[in-house]
Structures are given as C-alpha cells and as structure tokens.
C-alpha cells in the first residue's frame, strides 16, 4: 500500500459511526521532516516547526511554553503521551501527532469531529505502523 493510500483510506476517511465526519487534514511525515504523503488540505509547514515537534518528542514539555506551530497556526499543547503522542488545541479544533519508529502521523480536526475521534484515527494508524516496524 502506498503512503498516500494510508492517508486517504485510514486518516481522511469517514469516522466510524459518523458518516461525513472526517479530519480536516492529515499527513505522514518522516522524522527528518520529509513529507511521505499528505491530504490536499494539509498546511505547508516550515522545517523549524517540524524540528520543534521532534524536540518535544525527545524532550517532553519543550513546546508547552510557546505552543505547537504548524503551517503558521499555533496550537496550545494539551496532555499527550510523553515521547509518543503530542496533542494540541486551537478553538474548536486541534491536532494529534503520533510518533512511530520512522515517521510522524499527523491529523488536524475541526468540529464536529471531537478530539477523541481525531486521537483514535491518528493513533490507530500510528500503532499499526509501529507493529509493522515502521
């Protein structure tokens, strides 16, 4: 399966039991910041934004004082899982980032999608990739 198919079929799909509800944008990005696949709606990001995210995975709490920035949007960092998941909130939407062995799985959402639904979609694919050694 291509990386784009993972984004299209596993991240940008309808949320289970909620037809028509889906993430706003999603991507799979290598830990070096290279885009493996992304939705057409995924924001253009700066290398330093991805560097900040990677630093937070290695040094949990790094982004808390400044917020998580992606594509020029600032998210307030909320509870995640140190070294494994970063979660951010902005208004009625937010972001979930799951770290795998080689990549980051990113999902961005707005209402009516809930934070829990975004977490489920992103983390499920991330866990699958981890199981595959990716």
UniProtKB/Swiss-Prot annotation:
- Position of the signal peptide: none
Gene Ontology CC terms, in alphabetical order = cell cortex; cytoskeleton
Annotated S-S bridges: 13-118
Pfam families attached here?
Answer: Profilin (PF00235)
Q: Do you know which Gene3D superfamilies this protein is assigned to?
A: Dynein light chain 2a, cytoplasmic
Main localization category: cytoplasm
The UniProt PTM text for this protein says: Phosphorylated by MAP kinases.
TM helices/strands, residue ranges: none
- State the oligomer form and interacting partners: Occurs in many kinds of cells as a complex with monomeric actin in a 1:1 ratio.
Q: What is this protein called?
A: Profilin-2
| Originating species | Olea europaea
